[in-house]
Amino acid sequence: MKGTVFALGLLCVSATLTSCFKDEPLNAECDIEQAYIHVDNPEAMFFNNNDTLVKVLSSERNIKFKVLPEADITAVVPQFRVTPGATVAAVDGLPLNTPRDFSDGKTVQYTVTSEDGQWNRTYTVSMGMRTLDAISNFGFENVQMVTEGCNRPYDAWVESFDDGYIIDCWATGNGGFDISMGVEDDENHVTKDQFPSVSVDNGRTGKAVRLTTCDTGPFGHLMNMPIAAGNLFLGKFDLSEALGETLKATMFGVPVSKKPLNLSGYYKYKPGETFTNRDNKIDPTITDRGDIYAVLYRNTNEKGQAVTLDGGNVRTSNLIVATAIIDEVKTTDEWTFFNIPFTYTANIDPTTLARHGYNLAVVFTSSFKGADFQGAVGSTLYIDDVNLSWEE
């Protein structure tokens, strides 16, 4: 009975995380679900037509449109699809149909207010595009704390340029683990350092990433998700799918405009003692192991529709054109070098590449079957000093 009550309580908590939900007669949701721009000639402004629309995840507060470097963005009118009954207004008080100047990194803030008037969220809209291929070395020194829309704070990683420009390119499943562990004052309370994906100071150089397979507590067991592997990947994590179609929650890949040639870096790894399957049954025939791999894929299908690979197809999609997969993550207490060349299975269209028509996913995980909620609690993978080499 206690477990059932706990699970029902957590379901309520998860709803609040995704959309400001509250049991009121009028709708209490206050989200921007989509942002879009209508222009007569999208090819002159965007890399491809799909870039005219941005899907906004429930955890996001920054909305960035990907535009060509030469695009005129001095008089643009963003438009929004919001949750039913909600209203949106510019923070500066100007009408929504006012053309805005987004040149030179300028931003505009908009506030969404729920139908019941009790809740609001502020979003920042910007335009521009700097791709990941402008960076080669990833030391994971830039750590931010997620504090909004969660039960407890947890780590997240970003990359920054010399001028301070930030690329929010790395994602983890920490948000899903946060849901499974309930609110801060319950019996399953965990601290930031007990999350699956954590920043640590004892890196090979400076900080490192520690990925640990963790027990998800009574709620996770009830949902047939008994473990959460520590993971770090290029892409986004969709909290709205964390308790539903879980494989779709991991949205793998970010746009690139150069061909990746090699993925290298350093790791340490130790498997947990006991491997359990999704039913939380011990499987003595399997020793857990970590995984490191990268996938380059076309981000539009044959119909021209935008595609993002997820946990269900990131290794199998026919849109994949290159992979870099480690042969083995060995058990070791020492920082161990890995160097994985990309193997190309299809020709790269240089025009498509230049217009950001390919996405790159790089994935690190403490349990090789973590996407299916199988693994050994305590399996730990440390990652540091990762390098991506690009074709110039």
Segments predicted by a language model, with ranges:
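Beta-rich interaction/scaffold domains
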Residues: 20-138
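Extracellular-facing segments of soluble proteins and assemblies that are Gly/Ser/Thr-biased and enriched
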Residues: 215-302
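Residues within well-ordered beta-strands of beta-sheet-rich folds
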Residues: 111, 139, 262-268, 293-295, ...
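Extracellular carbohydrate recognition
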Residues: 352-357, 367-390
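Extracellular carbohydrate-recognition regions
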Residues: 129-186
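Extracellular carbohydrate recognition and processing domains
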Residues: 301-354, 376
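Short carbohydrate-recognition loop motifs
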Residues: 200-219
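Bacterial Sec-dependent N-terminal signal peptides
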Residues: 1-31
